[in-house]
Amino acid sequence: MKLFALLLVLAAPMRIAKDTTLPPNGVYHQAVIIAGSNLTFDCNGSTFIGEGIGVGILIQNRTSVTIRNCKVRGFDVGAYVLGGKNFVFERNDFSGNYVDDNSAIEDLKPIPHGGIILNGVQNSRLQGNTSNGNVAGIQILNSSKMRVLQNTTSRNRGWGIYLFGTTSSTIYTNTVEYNNRSCPQWGVDAGCGAAGIVLTQGSNRNLIGWNTLNYDGDGIYQGNTPGAASNDLEIFNNTIAHSVANGIEATFSLRNYIHDNTFTDDNYGAWFGYAQQLRFENNAIRNSHVKSVEHDNAQSSRYAGNLIDGADILLQPVQGGSCAGNSFSNNTRFNNAQIVTTGCQ
């Protein structure tokens, strides 16, 4: 297949078909093919260096493979997993692979480059990995029951952690910072579709909690069309600050529960265009530059127990839409913050 052909452009790949631990801290100018299942490949701190093309570690249709302590840089994709289940990636570094800039990625389609991509994978764990300085850090496509824990995905020129059609997964305790992008439309480091964590194309029933998201385009970006929305998410206990655009953007979604997060110094704390049956509860929103929350065409949504310091919460109908059936209770407002519902029923 195409990925395999790209591997062969480099030196002959290292083939791993059984449990393997490399000598410590080696340097290899070749790629790796995992050619078996039920095995552990421990790089023991060794580095695999590419020439700007191909895949560093390739796994296709395997099960129960563990990859640990590997450093992979200089490839088009640091690691690519296509099909299979029960993978573990732990304590690897996929930094310094393909990166580009200066175009909008607002359509939220997968980017076939970057740190690590998993496609069609079930019941797997990524823990304690680093994937910085790529176009995207971690991308998970068409998968389910994934656990993404304690990773660092920062200073990517697109997305830190990206879910596309991925369901019933947990994204916990990750550090996701400075994921930003430039584009001709908006300028240098203007967001341009970049975000810390992205959920799109029906990435439903996921849990997003205890993550640190600072200085990203959006902190968390769920969207961004009716057909691509992600529903029944729980987003909680995240620390979000200094987002270029929105701390959380969640558009066209249903039944998302967003609670106990802190938002500080974002352009908008949260933006919920066309979201319905939203529960936004017990969040603290401070010093947003434009609005603490803007929720266009809000319907059947509940705002309760939030602390709002500075900018207003605005619910409104737009473009002939409806704003109706929303409720507010026990929200605390400081520094002239208001809850504005002009035009809502």
Can you describe what each PLM-predicted range is?
Residues L3-A11:
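Sec-dependent N-terminal signal peptides
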Residues K18-Q30, L39-D76, V88-P112:
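Right-handed parallel beta-helix/beta-spiral solenoid domain characteristic of secreted/periplasmic
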